[in-house]
Amino acid sequence: MPQSDRVMISKQIIFPTLATLMLLTSCFTGVEGTKKITQKDVDKVVKELTDEEVKANSLAVPVDSFANWQAGKRFYVSDDNAKLIFANSDSYNADTLHLKGRELTYSGYYLGSVLDNRATVNVKFTDGVNTYVYVTDKTVQEIRPDYTIPFLIDMDVVEYINRQLCGKDCYVKTSIWYGEDERMIAGRKYVKVHIDDVKPGNKVFPIKVLFTDVETSRKAMLWMTLGGTVLKNRSFDALFSFSDVRKRYPNITDEVWRCIVEGKTQPGMTKDEVRLSLGTPEHVNQRPTYSGVKEYWYYTDGRYFYFEDGILVK
């Protein structure tokens, strides 16, 4: 067969094959599958914070290493179960001991020994009447600088945070507030508040921040954690901002922003606006269709929201 005929036959074979592949490729519209979106995909901000803004919104609390504790250092007892952590004593009846809400002072430590003959630290506290001993089962070298004792809140830390915050105005970032009776109440988010006081909290959240809504004069409080905890959503950075959050979203209308402040939604809101109002959903399903992208957001309280091309429908 002549060379020119072989080339012609090759072209006739290749061109229909390419055309067929292009036709087959165009048939995959994406309707066949449902894409599962992760929390990382959803949890986006409209405007990323700069390093300076992140630093400005952080609350660095210095660590008072155990090795530096001085006699007289004060601790707030956050729970009556504190009686379970102290060694038995003839000086008091542990069954009837109620220490919650009281302050204990550190009065030093002495070295004991256990079965492996290690010199372990026994920490002493007093309420002015009794001495309470906490057995660490650790040597001096094994005690980390950030060592804490269950149910005891370091009053030096509480007072340090109080000096940093009390009397200042900032912006609250959650609508889950607590009243003076410590019961949950519906609050407002991204509004200016005045910090009135910082007090010791409870066994889960060691810090209690009391504040006043500048616009409504309503008083409330929030529970807060410190660094080194898994409860990141209750840290200072998660609860408060020193800068006006509203200014980071200039394209959001005042009407929509009022919904966000009240933790509400309305049709026509964008996904970012809904996220600002309600937080990140538990999970998201995205379904591409011929008419556009349909997306469903599901929250832990049973609510779900339906978006078309990024706009809330219901």
Regions found by a protein language model. Name each.
Residues 5-17:
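Bacterial N-terminal signal peptides that target proteins for export
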Residues 24-26:
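C-terminal motif of bacterial Sec signal peptides marking the signal peptidase cleavage site
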